[in-house]
């Protein structure tokens, strides 16, 4: 907080806040809690929620998680969070507690957590910070795996992007999906006075100041802030999940909140302010792990804690449930009619603040300055390599394209036995037994390099790719969350990036008719070293939830598998759009060129058509063309299915592109489908922009252009490169 904030607080209060109240303001007025920079910009998302898109929204923006109706009374709670700063300082605990926190956000809605996804960003593994990057990867992946596995929630998807801009600020974003019946939904808003407040879990000294720590740049001295990183206990969280779900079944729980950022001061004030009441807290009743002062009790961010508002008279019944699971639980206060937070310690009032002041921080009006980095490429300088086989193999080994099996094999992705399509594909698919054969598809997306070059276009691309990924499994997008990861917004160029990305996400989501129902903003992902600024690439990571009508029709499921003789069809044309492409970066070390543009009208039609042919069970495999372009998508189709492909792009090359541009351009709107020969005419009749490019068979990937074999590779060789690259990078092969 700055001097103006302090003056404003003193003016409204008519006095100076005491040291506990000041700490509460510092946390609740932090960027992390109050969205002081972004709140005005986030209003752009309002246009995505309209009469058509809102019909299945049960709980929208403003709670710990959004709740979406899937079918009948079966609903899904969804939430997305970041744990970026803590995961750079202490990767294992930072990532583990990120998982714990997002699981509790979903749990606080009364939902059983059923899936996790983890969009991750790390620095250049081959660069000068390579050793640190490996250390961060090991810690983050182990933290996510250990915590998720121990609480019995499968990690079914995510992504992992590498770029030198993340050398000093890795990103750990986490998504959780939970299942809840509509009549058992709990919100985070206590709406009546006289409710008893029960705190579950014990409070220690860990994580004090975590919210304010997450609201500033990292510096060379940030290592000293390790105490701001919380420490998780997955076994306690597993007990907490089971106990909370049992307590919800009593019907006595009226509101519930996870104790995350700002600890008890945040959870109690937000719960009461959101419901239009106040609260009185008795801090001596809080169960402590060690002797703490009232100040420490109010701002501790100890993990595995929940605040419940319950019917008066039901306290003993609720506490007994938690005792059964050996979890500390105590009545620590009550809701009151006055919209204030009053905290007492052994009879003495230590906090007395109006909630509207505490929970409504003044918003910033920041200035933006255009910083468009996209520029034309010079094809005279960027020559086509002679050996395109070598180029494709090198791309299959690049960190952004190679298999991330090394990561996801550390996660249990099949616990709860719902997983139909596992990690490694374009979207995860889970069956929802309560409404079988219906299921859900889950995807996270963002190409931060596109967003650096052209933030608006990059953000539109993220939404288009998510919709495309869902189309490959026949899923209709029904809700979207965003996790906005940016540098220091006090610098006009970064604020401009933030505004442009939000505008791009909002415009694309509105066009594709996907309501944006929640998310998270993580700013100050920027480090200053010896006076030099190191901001991350703007990274508006998104999660899109899709509805699958029949999981048995999804390509690759049951007998619906790719086989010899299948015909290969591609949607949309390929254009010269090389800006930010993996090919240009890895092979030519440049980011020049035009970032792919999304033709919203055309692509919406393509995705709807692909969705329909997949839903009819006419597609045996579907692969999204994104990083690495058409050649990489074909290679991955061959590798993942252990089968050869014979492709001829001569007729398809309508734009007479140079061979390398045709193979590696990342034009949006392209999906490669494999279909049975007897179904090809039916499929083509349903697609408005589609071309036959080859067939499935043999043991090699052969790509011809104008009678010339431009690619001819053994599938086994491609598999070796694709699967061994990451373990080699981590020093294990």
Swiss-Prot record:
<feature type="binding site">
    <location>
        <position position="258"/>
    </location>
    <ligand>
        <name>Mg(2+) 2</name>
    </ligand>
</feature>
<keyword id="KW-0479">Metal-binding</keyword>
<feature type="binding site">
    <location>
        <position position="81"/>
    </location>
    <ligand>
        <name>Mg(2+) 1</name>
    </ligand>
</feature>
<feature type="binding site">
    <location>
        <begin position="82"/>
        <end position="85"/>
    </location>
    <ligand>
        <name>substrate</name>
    </ligand>
</feature>
<feature type="active site" description="Proton acceptor">
    <location>
        <position position="83"/>
    </location>
</feature>
<keyword id="KW-0067">ATP-binding</keyword>
<feature type="binding site">
    <location>
        <position position="522"/>
    </location>
    <ligand>
        <name>substrate</name>
    </ligand>
</feature>
<dbReference type="InterPro" id="IPR036921">
    <property type="entry name" value="PurM-like_N_sf"/>
</dbReference>
<keyword id="KW-0658">Purine biosynthesis</keyword>
<comment type="pathway">
    <text>Purine metabolism; IMP biosynthesis via de novo pathway; 5-amino-1-(5-phospho-D-ribosyl)imidazole from N(2)-formyl-N(1)-(5-phospho-D-ribosyl)glycinamide: step 1/2.</text>
</comment>
<dbReference type="GO" id="GO:0006164">
    <property type="term" value="P:purine nucleotide biosynthetic process"/>
</dbReference>
<comment type="function">
    <text>Part of the phosphoribosylformylglycinamidine synthase complex involved in the purines biosynthetic pathway. Catalyzes the ATP-dependent conversion of formylglycinamide ribonucleotide (FGAR) and glutamine to yield formylglycinamidine ribonucleotide (FGAM) and glutamate. The FGAM synthase complex is composed of three subunits. PurQ produces an ammonia molecule by converting glutamine to glutamate. PurL transfers the ammonia molecule to FGAR to form FGAM in an ATP-dependent manner.</text>
</comment>
<dbReference type="GO" id="GO:0005524">
    <property type="term" value="F:ATP binding"/>
</dbReference>
<feature type="binding site">
    <location>
        <position position="520"/>
    </location>
    <ligand>
        <name>Mg(2+) 1</name>
    </ligand>
</feature>
<dbReference type="GO" id="GO:0000287">
    <property type="term" value="F:magnesium ion binding"/>
</dbReference>
<dbReference type="Pfam" id="PF02769">
    <property type="entry name" value="AIRS_C"/>
</dbReference>
<dbReference type="InterPro" id="IPR010918">
    <property type="entry name" value="PurM-like_C_dom"/>
</dbReference>
<feature type="active site">
    <location>
        <position position="32"/>
    </location>
</feature>
<dbReference type="Pfam" id="PF18072">
    <property type="entry name" value="FGAR-AT_linker"/>
</dbReference>
<comment type="similarity">
    <text>Belongs to the FGAMS family.</text>
</comment>
<feature type="binding site">
    <location>
        <position position="519"/>
    </location>
    <ligand>
        <name>ATP</name>
    </ligand>
</feature>
<dbReference type="GO" id="GO:0005737">
    <property type="term" value="C:cytoplasm"/>
</dbReference>
<feature type="binding site">
    <location>
        <position position="230"/>
    </location>
    <ligand>
        <name>substrate</name>
    </ligand>
</feature>
<feature type="binding site">
    <location>
        <position position="35"/>
    </location>
    <ligand>
        <name>ATP</name>
    </ligand>
</feature>
<keyword id="KW-0547">Nucleotide-binding</keyword>
<dbReference type="InterPro" id="IPR036676">
    <property type="entry name" value="PurM-like_C_sf"/>
</dbReference>
<feature type="binding site">
    <location>
        <begin position="301"/>
        <end position="303"/>
    </location>
    <ligand>
        <name>substrate</name>
    </ligand>
</feature>
<dbReference type="GO" id="GO:0004642">
    <property type="term" value="F:phosphoribosylformylglycinamidine synthase activity"/>
</dbReference>
<dbReference type="GO" id="GO:0006189">
    <property type="term" value="P:'de novo' IMP biosynthetic process"/>
</dbReference>
<dbReference type="InterPro" id="IPR010074">
    <property type="entry name" value="PRibForGlyAmidine_synth_PurL"/>
</dbReference>
<keyword id="KW-0963">Cytoplasm</keyword>
<dbReference type="Pfam" id="PF00586">
    <property type="entry name" value="AIRS"/>
</dbReference>
<feature type="binding site">
    <location>
        <position position="104"/>
    </location>
    <ligand>
        <name>substrate</name>
    </ligand>
</feature>
<keyword id="KW-0460">Magnesium</keyword>
<protein>
    <recommendedName>
        <fullName>Phosphoribosylformylglycinamidine synthase subunit PurL</fullName>
        <ecNumber>6.3.5.3</ecNumber>
    </recommendedName>
</protein>
<feature type="binding site">
    <location>
        <position position="482"/>
    </location>
    <ligand>
        <name>ATP</name>
    </ligand>
</feature>
<dbReference type="InterPro" id="IPR016188">
    <property type="entry name" value="PurM-like_N"/>
</dbReference>
<keyword id="KW-0436">Ligase</keyword>
<comment type="subunit">
    <text>Monomer. Part of the FGAM synthase complex composed of 1 PurL, 1 PurQ and 2 PurS subunits.</text>
</comment>
<feature type="binding site">
    <location>
        <position position="105"/>
    </location>
    <ligand>
        <name>Mg(2+) 2</name>
    </ligand>
</feature>
<dbReference type="InterPro" id="IPR041609">
    <property type="entry name" value="PurL_linker"/>
</dbReference>
